[in-house]
């Protein structure tokens, strides 16, 4: 069992039951999945960009991402239907908890000028989104071997009904909120 998974069962669940007064353990919010998404609009010009991005996401997530393709043609962006324009990977279970552990304890502190993550990036249904500007904050990425700095979006889906419950859940995982 992953370190954060044990931490959730032993510390987070009792703390949230005490804070929100849940009657059952099954009412306590939990993280269901984490999705990493990398949009690669510049991949239209060069196919190697997709390969490098897939390699980076594979190292970061520990599993192979799926290449997302354009749903429809957009002439202004020089994109045809079916062109590869991104990569995404969905993490669940043990891999999800291990990624969350690495993200909170190792990757976030490596962000330049880091003052904490925004407490307002919740969607109203208990899900949280973080944008990362550079993939080099992850220790799995070798700085000398990257071709370009690419950002990615990290979406954390929870079973929380409200944003307050989700924020309390993530804060109990030692998420460094700034407000």
Swiss-Prot record:
Subunit-structure text: Part of the 50S ribosomal subunit; part of the 5S rRNA/L5/L18/L25 subcomplex. Contacts the 5S rRNA and the P site tRNA. Forms a bridge to the 30S subunit in the 70S ribosome.
Function statement: This is one of the proteins that bind and probably mediate the attachment of the 5S RNA into the large ribosomal subunit, where it forms part of the central protuberance. In the 70S ribosome it contacts protein S13 of the 30S subunit (bridge B1b), connecting the 2 subunits; this bridge is implicated in subunit movement. Contacts the P site tRNA; the 5S rRNA and some of its associated proteins might help stabilize positioning of ribosome-bound tRNAs.
Recorded superkingdom: Bacteria
Keywords annotated in UniProt: Ribonucleoprotein, Ribosomal protein, RNA-binding, rRNA-binding, tRNA-binding
UniProt cross-references to NCBIfam families, sorted A to Z: PRK00010.1 (NF000585)
Membership in a protein family: Belongs to the universal ribosomal protein uL5 family.
Lineage, top ranks: Bacteria, Pseudomonadati, Pseudomonadota, Betaproteobacteria, Burkholderiales
This protein's name: Large ribosomal subunit protein uL5
BP terms from Gene Ontology: translation
Gene Ontology CC terms: ribonucleoprotein complex; ribosome
Pfam families linked: Ribosomal_L5, Ribosomal_L5_C
GO molecular function terms noted in the UniProt entry: rRNA binding; structural constituent of ribosome; tRNA binding
């Amino acid at each position: 069992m992953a370190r954060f998974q044990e931490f959730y069962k032993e510390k987070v669940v009792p703390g949230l039951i005490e804070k929100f007064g849940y009657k059952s353990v099954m009412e306590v919010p939990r993280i269901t999945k984490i999705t990493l998404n990398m949009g690669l609009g510049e991949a239209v010009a060069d196919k190697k960009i997709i390969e490098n991005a897939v390699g980076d996401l594979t190292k970061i997530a520990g599993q192979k991402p799926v290449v997302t393709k354009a749903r429809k043609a957009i002439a202004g962006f020089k994109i045809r239907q079916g062109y590869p324009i991104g990569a995404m990977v969905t993490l669940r279970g043990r891999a999800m908890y291990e990624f969350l552990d690495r993200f909170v304890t190792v990757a976030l502190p490596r962000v330049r000028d880091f003052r904490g993550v925004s407490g307002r990036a919740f969607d109203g249904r208990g899900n949280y989104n973080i944008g990362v500007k550079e993939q080099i904050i992850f220790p799995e990425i070798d700085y000398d071997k990257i071709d370009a700095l690419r950002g990615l979006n990290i979406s954390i889906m929870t079973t929380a009904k409200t944003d307050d419950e989700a924020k309390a859940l993530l804060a109990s995982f030692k998420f460094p909120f700034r407000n």
